Amino acid sequence: MDGFAGSLDDSISAASTSDVQDRLSALESRVQQQEDEITVLKAALADVLRRLAISEDHVASVKKSMPSKGQPSLREAISMSCITNGSGISRKQNHTSSVSIARKETLSSAAKSGTEKKKEKPQGQREKKEDSHSNDQSPQIRASPSPQPSSQPLQINRQTPESKSSAPIKSIKRPPTAEKSHNSWENSDDSRNKLMKTVSTSKLISKVIKNADKHKDVIVNQAKMSTREKNSQEGEYIKMFMRGRPITMFIPSDVDNYDDIRTELPPEKLKLEWVYGYRGKDCRANVYLLPTGEIVYFIASVVVLFNYEERTQRHYLGHTDCVRCLAVHPDKIRIATGQIAGVDKDGRPLQPHVRVWDSVSLTTLHVIGLGTFERGVGCLDFSKADSGVHLCVIDDSNEHMLTVWDWQKKSKIAEIKTTNEVVLAVEFHPTDANTIITCGKSHIFFWTWSGNSLTRKQGIFGKYEKPKFVQCLAFLGNGDVLTGDSGGVMLIWSKTMVEPPPGKGPKGVYQINRQIKAHDGSVFTLCQMRNGMLLTGGGKDRKIILWDHDLNLEREIEVPDQYGTIRAVAEGRAEQFLVGTSRNFILRGTFNDGFQIEVQGHRDELWGLATHPFKDLLLTCAQDRQVCMWNSVEHRLEWTRLVDEPGHCADFHPSGTVVAIGTHSGRWFVLDAETRDLVSIHTDGNEQLSVMRYSVDGTLLAVGSHDNFIYLYTVLENGRKYSRYGKCTGHSSYITHLDWSPDNKHIMSNSGDYEILYWDIENGCKLIRNRSDCKDIDWTTYTCVLGFQVFGVWPEGSDGTDINALVRSHNRRVIAVADDFCKVHLFQYPCSKAKAPSHKYSAHSSHVTNVSFTHNDSHLISTGGKDMSIIQWKLVEKLPVPQNEVITDASVTKTPASSSETARPSNSPPLPPSLPLTGTAEEESRMGSSPTLVENSLEQIAEPSEEQSEWGSEDLGVVIDEEPASELSETQGATELPEEERGITPLC
């Protein structure tokens, strides 16, 4: 204890009453001494407040006498707000006296008052207008930042000028304990210094805030920011807050006045051009051939119409989340697609629904089921006997509600609970308009529909083995029902017209009259062909079998193992047929010639993306261990290679000859970009590698890891030889992004705890303590999500994980951002104002994991995480069109077109924009937007105008912190699925 020399034996102390009394006396003396110190402290504090008031009065008078924008008051008031977070400094200008509150090495540093001499201003540091003005009456104000410790990347040290009479005091870094012992109480100035280090800042803050009330009109725009993201400016830096943590970003020297910076919408926009991939992993019966020669299927929230002969795609873009099922109208033109529930950009739920749309014009005809379905739409079917007037739907609720709709009137006719077990299919009988059949786990139900009532009759298996799953339905020419089950058996159900014995059930019950062993493993899909023959697809055996009119096996063919098991079979042109597989392939084949791949994609979560430095190529890698090279002009796969580890990140060498791929285990591979041969393999740590980045000349490679280190390698022979150069150590969390300087001497990096650190690579990969030294570096690439040039892309109230990737275009005009809310954003570059506006686009149905521009900035590539999609966007520019130009749609209100889009750099004619739907319900109006033509962009019609940011309304106080809805399981009781379905988890 203080006040005692040495230590006392506990037994003697306890036994001696006199020692206890001595201790109490010493404690009383110390308490009295501390009370005296507090009294002196209060006096010093009063003096500090008096000096602050005088300084503010002087600044106010200077403001009135000079034609300025109130910069001194703005900086002064915001600096005070920085003190409240323990991370700022106060800078005053006074010809009589001034107070400097300077940062030390800890966040709770105190301030020194009044006697320090002015410091020399470092070369390149900018002077303020008010500084030069006050120089007429007082010494020139100068500032000198001091180095920062790596463990406190958000701290800023700044020395401020004092009066002419102040004595020189050196700025020396020392531990707080040493500094405390160095100070003395011999004079009033030193006494105040000591007291300012021990005083609680809360009372000072309250006084400072009161004194700053006069500046409320100046800082109102800053004050409206939420406490979770509050920008503050003092001289040379901007500070934003994320989850309560301050992030400091130094302003480049070429910014003369931060208040003059304006961030607007970029003239460039995005138009969806191509979608790579297909969702077959956890869906069924979702591939069909239309009379237009197009294959219709879906992935993410996009329904794709692909003409495999002309190699063109069109896209229906009306859905707001995962599309889960698809049905084609008997006229083969109209299509119904169902989606799951989702959330909008503000976290509000988007209800599951069915959209009926025209496959020729891509216009939405009707939106059905808003507020009716729960979780999602599992399966649906158009009626056939009455030419498709009605639509039946099974939702994903626990009761799996069956509803029948007059879809043209959007009216629900009948509704009933089916079962708590999984329902896999629903179909109208093709000749009996009043019969609906559902099947699923251990059941098949025959429903009689009459008016607004539905009556259920359960199929009885009797002497036949009851299957675990009845997986699919089809109808024979005589009206019999054909089912395929998990045992590989086809059952024929015939409707008996014999009057049953009393009490044995009603007339017209479906009974089994024949059983056929069709496949080893499950019968996954049935397809009735136009000529009356039947195609079946097996699960485990991967066979496509053709059956004649009497259900005798005629021909068969096996799908190669690398494509996976069969999920969908559809009739194609002539003798062709289409097959969708569990590994997300769509194959076109015949029994004579075998199979040809038409569509393919990744089959597990996708993160890695890199674009070629000078060719129209892009590379992706995913958790499925596939590395794929795509041609962005011909829209096809160049090559694919299976590696030993799940891939997570990638980057091309500037020569374009090799590409580096980082994996989840710390290993990284270098592959030849032409031959896909393995060039090199290395290991750095045993955790996930999050970023690979070559320097601009390709002589160095930086590898960012989840073990908090950045590993540096020298690169020789155009990327074919690597040797360890060094390691950057200093981050307190995993590396997320990094960028190189043009001279290869510096790296900027971000980490999982929102650090922005800079590294001196030339001098041994050392951490640069004085981060302001790097504020003027023009980075070769910009992929870091935190930095002065890009911090405006962050939403208010962000938890720091909302943005997964960011990339600046090569021409430095725009920034593309991938977020956790299924959106791709396009911002202007630089983006240095909070809540900057952006163009926003929807097509993904999962978190968008990565974005990258092609080498000539003609296209942007985005990747979806769990939706496994790769989407190629074309950059276009807006051009005005006549105000009286309108587009007519059966369900769209005539609206003057405000703009059109033409491709940049081509000179194609203007394209008509998409138009909003008319509707009575607000929810339906919001969700009813759909594309009119394929050329339309994906911007949501019912979202706020682009003059407002995606992240909120014009009210800066809005905080958006809701999380997206949790993913829904496709089935309950997945553990009981057939063998070929086990382990398959639904994507949404």
From Swiss-Prot:
A single GO molecular function term of this UniProt record: alpha-tubulin binding
Disordered: annotated span: 106-194, 887-988
Region (Microtubule-binding): 1-260
SMART domains xrefs: WD40 (SM00320)
Composition bias, Basic and acidic residues: 114-134, 176-193
Stretch forming the signal peptide: none
Record-given protein name: Echinoderm microtubule-associated protein-like 4
Gene symbol of the encoding locus: Eml4
